[in-house]
């Protein structure tokens, strides 16, 4: 959304599908009796450690990037901007639940207390947008994530610049 000429201070986009959290990287240790040559130091070591991001995380991060490009026209916040990220994570209503429970879920009376944890939902979205929507997710100074049920599972994301106020906090 643009307000006041070409000044964009907020973007919104929706990632369709079930919310996905950031998976923990798996550490793989490889052994070679002949050794591995370290590219930086030139030293030869018998073991090499490699961190591998789970495939599901890589696929979801790529989906987030594609959706952002498509819905936000490649907008990027200034490198010095302080950002506020709001996430609404809508989980699918389980088919196995009773009609009464499903109605309560749809009305927001019952909310998800299941995985993925909201911090991992935030992390996968924030990391996906590094160097695309902003320089780095360290620019996010305020964040809120809320979990709901819906017949239409999705993740809604709003990112906006934080207004600088003169009063001190803390």
Show where each model-derived region lies:
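Acidic, proline/glycine-enriched N-terminal capping motif
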Residues: 2-170
């Amino acid at each position: 959304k643009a307000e006041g000429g070409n000044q964009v201070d907020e973007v919104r986009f929706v990632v369709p599908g079930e919310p996905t959290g950031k998976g923990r990287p798996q550490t793989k240790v490889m052994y070679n009796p002949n050794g591995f040559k370290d590219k930086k130091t030139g030293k030869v070591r018998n073991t090499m450690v490699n961190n591998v991001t789970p495939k599901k995380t890589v696929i979801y991060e790529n989906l987030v990037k594609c959706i952002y490009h498509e819905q936000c026209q490649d907008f990027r916040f200034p490198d010095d901007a302080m950002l506020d990220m709001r996430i609404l994570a809508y989980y699918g209503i389980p088919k196995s639940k009773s009609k009464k429970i499903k109605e309560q879920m749809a009305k927001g009376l019952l909310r998800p207390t299941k995985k993925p944890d909201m911090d991992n939902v935030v992390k996968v979205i924030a990391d996906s947008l590094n160097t695309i929507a902003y320089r780095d997710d360290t620019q996010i100074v305020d964040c809120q994530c809320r979990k709901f049920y819906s017949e239409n599972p999705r993740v809604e994301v709003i990112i906006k610049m934080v207004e600088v106020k003169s009063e001190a906090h803390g």
